[in-house]
């Protein structure tokens, strides 16, 4: 396996590397796995293994030219994430073999589904790169929306049918609710999903407003298609409360109602715009903007990039010692490269202490370090905060006392995918569980993992 263009200043190019390749082939190598780029930094690695927001299959033309000059089969991997692109590369004679590493991490049954002519059921790779970054942050190549990858021993890729069919309600159509409904339907249960809004996807619908993260739509689209295939009754524009659910004859209710932006509880916090409103376009802001990130995910990075691209002068502030502490190296490097080019200023180790509104309509933001009395200030046209979410748990809270399990999740069963059999209230007519951000502020992967673990036990 070797690169045929290091794509860097003073790096080796196709001519030199073809000579190296020919020497290797003369030494007895039977197949060449040809790549583009180099791997000596996170940023350069994203050129070899492009991530979300970057072009698909960017090196096909280069590798096609290389193939014509070699007398052994040539394989290539480089964000060839879908079957049509792979098929084209083979049929057009550009490649002899296609490497689809991340696509197989997302769906190990991809080859089987091609053979069975069920390509429409392939779980798509969305390029989030949780798999690659996860090797270094979590010690395993997890997939953002396949919770079984990396956990096959306790959470197999296949879902066993339930011994007895049940009538189950899922409340909420975000990532957690969609995965819950899919898992329950795969087990053979009768499933009804209630979503208060007019579309499925939850917070993904906000995230995809950033051009860099549009591929996340694949998480929603695949599950929506699977729910249709599996016969799940999806009810949009359907707000349901505890009384609606408790009297509907369900055997189990899974609450996946998500969360709402967490309020910034500081003096003058009412002057802060919520990140969701700005990302969704509901609120517009220009001029000098301070973004306060006390969450550490990609949300503040999306905010900074979008606002800076629209002409705002942006300062991104975090109380942490590093920016975006929960974002992996490959993803972070792509954002930081863009933000640096846009002139975004980065400030670490600063808490947003208080805010004052000035007579001219601007705001003074007072920053300081944790437990320190001194302050420094910024005068800006607007302040946006990203602080995670607060669980929306009203429906769950009201159902707990009516349920047979008292809302309890058996931890050992959760870990190993066993049945949830806890009985705390013998008079209860149904079980109730909550998953995803309805428990606490986390992310897409955690929400889907919750759903997979809990619902396999129902």
List PLM regions with ranges.
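Rossmann-like dinucleotide/flavin-binding elements
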Residues: 162-196, 200, 236-249, 256-329, ...
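Local beta-strand N-terminus motif with an aromatic residue
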Residues: 29, 95, 250-251, 380-381
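Rossmann-like dinucleotide-binding cores of NAD(P)H-dependent redox enzymes
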Residues: 190-230, 297-352
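Generic beta-strand/beta-sheet core signal
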Residues: 1-3, 34-37, 77, 92, ...
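Flavin-dependent oxidoreductase catalytic cores
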Residues: 1-171, 175, 179-186, 190-191, ...
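Short beta-alpha connecting loops at secondary-structure transitions
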Residues: 45-52, 96-97, 204-212, 433-440
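Short, hydrophobic/aromatic-rich segments at coil-to-beta transitions
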Residues: 359-365
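A structural motif corresponding to the C-terminal end of an alpha-helix
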Residues: 26-30, 65-73, 223-235, 342-345, ...
